[in-house]
Structures are given as C-alpha cells and as structure tokens.
Amino acid sequence: MSAPFPARPRIAIIGSGAVGCYYGGRLAQHGHDVHFLLRSDHDVVKAGGLHVKSCDGDFHLPQVNCHRSTAEIGPCDLVIVAMKTTANEALPGLIPPLLGTGPETMILTLQNGLGSDDFLAECFGSGRVLGGLCFVCINRLGPGRIEHFAQGHVSLGEHSG
C-alpha cells in the first residue's frame, strides 16, 4: 500500500450476512464510514437499521449506508468480503466499482474455507489482498438482526504471493 491509510476509511461490506453485518456494524458503531451491499434485506435495514444483540453489549444503528449495487457505493479504501465462498465467481464483477484509480484500495477476505485470498489475488493483485480468520460465534436472526454469542477476534495477514 503506497499511500497512508486514512484515519476514517471508507469501507464496503460485500456479504452482509452474520459476519459482514457484525463486523461492519462494529466498525460503523465506532465512527467508520461503512457501506453495506444489501439485496434481499435492503428495504428492512434501510427502514429499521441494524440490530446487534451481543455478549459484549447490544447496539442498534438506526441509519445504515445500504446499497443495492457496488456501483452505488463507489470507490473505497477497504473492501471486506464476507460472503459465502460458493458465490466467489461474482466477485470479479462486484469489486471493480469499489477500487480507486490506484492500488491503494485493500481487499480483506473474512470467508470460510481455503483459497479465497488466492482467488482474489489472481483477480485483483496480491498487493491488495489481506486474509482474515474470524474466531467468533454469531448468527443472523433475520433481516438486519444479528446475535453475537462469543469471542470476536480476527487475525489478519498479507497475501504471500
């Protein structure tokens, strides 16, 4: 990453299920500029916000930056991919509108399984890709409703390619 990371980065969440909503919600709760790609849950979250019941303290975000397409979100500093790996074939079409004109946009995968970081590196270059492992127990209760039972630690690493 050639440019310094901004103090208040613009963050896109791709895959707004339990993992994406929990970590994106925590980032938004602490003042970050977080934008969620939402499809089926869009209208519910737009109207009622994001509700997180957590062992670390419940919170509600009444206003959420939710979008139906990545083109609506536009360029970001960080893209967090938290969708199921079975949908990875959609990523080469979803991520480009989120990338800036230079190499500064980073892509962090918080997906289950192996190979997601390699796939992203092949598509967008290894210098942009970070791998993440989530040690957390969470569940999506319904549209805009997440329950966090335990832990929440994330380990990060640069792509080795």
Can you describe what each PLM-predicted range is?
Residues 60-147, 155:
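Rossmann-like NAD(P)(H) cofactor-binding subdomain of soluble oxidoreductases
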Residues 2-58:
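NAD(P)+-binding Rossmann beta1-loop-alpha1 motif at the extreme N-terminus of oxidoreductases
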Residues 150-161:
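Conserved anion/nucleotide-ligand pocket segment
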Residues 4-5, 146-149:
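Solvent-exposed alpha-helices and their adjacent loops that cap or buttress functional pockets
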Residues 14-19, 23-24, 48, 112, ...:
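Short glycine-rich loop/turn motifs that provide flexible caps or phosphate-binding loops at active sites
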Residues 41, 113, 152:
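A generic "binding-loop/recognition-motif" signal
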